[in-house]
């Protein structure tokens, strides 16, 4: 299977010309009826490893390199299970067994290097979505997929939904943690040519055994029946800008009437939640209309060092130890993507205004590490 997968990845890099006679269906709605060996099921299972706005128009290929569905957006979906299905006659049991993945062009350059056991040759960083998780790996040992028996205690991670950053230069990830039990982005295969960043999303620990100990997790996403000016509601609204495994134990801060920062809840995990809407609530008496209006963000310590540098007009790398991360799962109220500080749509350049939904922000210590990334948010 490994040889087949390597051949397939090489074919992707030079272009495949074998296409299954199946028209593209621009939908990622419910699981199709029928056998899991069918083209229809595979297209659904593989493509939905990415968010719907990528899944709907990505190319989908099978394990042998056959193109099941031609895409238009530069992303490619495939099964990442090098062992193949446990039941070949009936296909993969589910999307998790398939280890479905959706990657951009640079991620396949990374994968080719990994499969060849050579240093990946890349033009820029690559990204891979795996919203159905994987089958497990030793976090510190490349080529350990499925080898739990020979993995030291505490090193095995079977991931749920996540996004991966495959760096052109692994040294750009120096300073990131290797601890996968905190919910923070963490480094896998540290110290090798295949070091990459794992970015957990909601449900990340659904397959992990034993589960990490995360206090207060059960009720972290339940909106309280309380005034939107209350500490109780603000704690919920601000903290849930991050996945539950971070939201449950982050510090939550607010501003008092005099503009002084106050702590609504002390946290334990190094993340801090706050409202980031500089305009304030449209209705000050009743507070934020909803969590979206508050524009809450949950950031790690390095992201706040970036924010401090931004407002001070200094370079972030003078105050940051590594890249920072900030979750905004309730989105924001909009800004100009090309001009810092433009928060009114009427002042924005035409075509540059973006009001974001749920997202995660990477705040780089060195902006040059993002060279080559697109500015196209459409």
Where do the protein language model's features map onto the residues?
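Sec-dependent signal peptide recognition
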Residues: 2-7
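C-terminal motif of bacterial Sec signal peptides marking the signal peptidase cleavage site
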Residues: 14-15
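Intrinsically disordered, low-complexity proline-rich regions
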Residues: 20-24
């Amino acid at each position: 299977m490994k040889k087949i997968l390597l051949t397939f990845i090489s074919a992707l890099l030079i272009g495949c010309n074998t296409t299954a006679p199946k028209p593209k269906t621009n939908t990622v709605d419910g699981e199709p009826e029928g056998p899991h060996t069918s083209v229809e099921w595979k297209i659904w299972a593989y493509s939905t490893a990415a968010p719907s706005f990528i899944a709907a128009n990505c190319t989908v290929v099978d394990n042998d390199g056959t193109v099941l569905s031609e895409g238009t957006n530069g992303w490619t979906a495939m099964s990442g299970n090098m062992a193949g299905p446990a039941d070949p006659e009936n296909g993969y049991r589910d999307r998790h067994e398939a280890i479905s993945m959706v990657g951009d062009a640079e991620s396949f350059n990374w994968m080719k290097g990994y499969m060849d056991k050579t240093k990946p040759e890349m033009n820029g960083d690559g990204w891979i979505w795996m919203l159905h998780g994987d089958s497990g790996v030793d976090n510190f040992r490349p080529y350990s997929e499925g080898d739990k028996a020979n993995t030291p205690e505490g090193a095995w991670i079977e991931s749920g939904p996540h996004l991966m950053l495959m760096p052109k230069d692994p040294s750009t990830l120096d300073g990131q943690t290797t601890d996968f039990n905190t919910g923070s982005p963490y480094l896998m295969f540290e110290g090798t040519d295949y070091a990459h960043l794992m970015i957990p999303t909601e449900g990340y620990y659904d397959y992990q055994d034993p589960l990490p100990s995360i206090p207060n997790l059960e009720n972290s996403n339940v909106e309280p029946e309380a005034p939107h000016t209350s500490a109780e509601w603000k704690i919920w609204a601000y903290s849930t800008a991050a996945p539950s495994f971070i939201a449950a134990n982050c510090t939550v801060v607010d501003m008092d009437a005099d503009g002084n920062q106050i702590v609504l809840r002390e946290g334990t995990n190094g993340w801090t939640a706050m409202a980031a809407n500089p305009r304030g609530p449209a209705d000050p008496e009743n507070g934020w209309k909803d969590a979206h209006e508050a524009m809450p963000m949950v950031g790690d310590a390095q992201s706040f060092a970036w924010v401090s540098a931004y407002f001070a007009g200094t370079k972030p790398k003078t105050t940051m130890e590594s890249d920072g991360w900030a979750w905004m799962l309730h989105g924001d109220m909009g800004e100009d993507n090309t001009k810092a500080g433009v928060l009114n749509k009427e002042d924005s350049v035409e075509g540059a205004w973006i009001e974001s939904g749920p997202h995660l922000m990477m705040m780089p210590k060195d902006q040059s590490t993002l060279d080559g990334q697109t500015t196209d948010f459409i």
